[in-house]
A protein has these predicted regions:
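Nucleic-acid endonuclease domains
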Residues: 1-108, 120-246
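Active-site beta-strand termini and strand-to-loop segments that position acidic
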Residues: 110-114
Length: 246
């Protein structure tokens, strides 16, 4: 499969999509999955049971607890999405809900038949798999987890994203929130998702070697400023979910 680079705009820092994939809902997450993801995200942010990095590896912006909650909630929802999709055909572990100290929380993976899967999330209108450049070596291994080798990396897109809801309710930059009151914002939301595709470790090594990079300070689609430098793969270039085999 060919990989396409982002197109440079009139401004050198403006980058535009060249290979997109329309959002196509696969399913709606069961409420019990949503509640588990919510509880985990709350404890890792407002609850302070664990610790999430307040900034990206190559970034400088320090996130507030409300932002950490929203980002963590989205990520865990998307892990449950992959779990619900793949459990139909594979023996797969449930998403990890343990709260760890700093540096351990993002060492999450699914394991199927000895193969490790990494899950990345984005909003429903997203078209990029983003991997922070400082976190990966030239072998496509994840440096913060002792150079862990992921065999597959999936991208999941979710509608009604937590960040959008938190922003609308003016809670995104909050320092503290009551758990029961916060849950009321999310319990009746329909959490539907799609999976635009996945890449293999060999694909990742190719992307790294050929410098598929969007830099800190670049503007995605000319408007979204990148806070960190990332390797990327466009959604339209990813292998479709139906091609996943072990």
């Amino acid at each position: 499969m060919a990989f396409n680079k982002l197109k440079q705009g009139v401004s050198q820092r403006a980058k535009f999509f060249t290979s997109t994939k329309p959002y196509k809902s696969l399913a709606v997450l069961p409420l019990q999955d949503v509640k588990k993801a919510f509880d985990f995200a709350y404890e890792m942010s407002f609850g302070k049971s664990g610790e999430h990095r307040d900034h990206r590896s190559g970034g400088s912006y320090e996130r507030k607890p409300g932002e950490i909650f929203a980002n963590t909630f989205q990520g865990k929802l998307c892990e449950f999405a992959i779990y619900e999709v793949l459990r139909k055909n594979f023996d797969i572990n449930e998403p990890d809900l343990e709260t760890y100290g700093l540096g351990k929380w993002d060492d999450f993976d699914f394991e199927i038949k000895g193969k490790l899967l990494s899950i990345k999330s984005t909003k429903s209108f997203g078209h990029l798999l983003l991997l922070e450049k400082k976190d990966w070596n030239d072998k496509g291994e994840y440096i913060p987890s002792d150079n862990k080798h992921y065999d597959f990396t999936f991208l999941v897109r979710i509608k009604n994203d937590p960040e959008g809801i938190m922003k609308r309710e003016r809670k995104l930059y909050s320092l503290n929130e009551n758990k029961d009151e916060l849950w009321k914002l999310f319990k009746d939301v329909s959490w539907d998702f799609d999976v635009p595709g996945f890449i293999t470790n060999a694909d990742l090594v190719y992307l790294i070697k050929n410098e598929f990079i969007i830099y800190r300070g670049d503007y995605l689609n000319g408007k979204t400023r990148m806070d960190a430098t990332n390797y990327y793969c466009q959604a339209g270039d990813m292998k479709p979910l139906d091609d996943f085999r072990l």
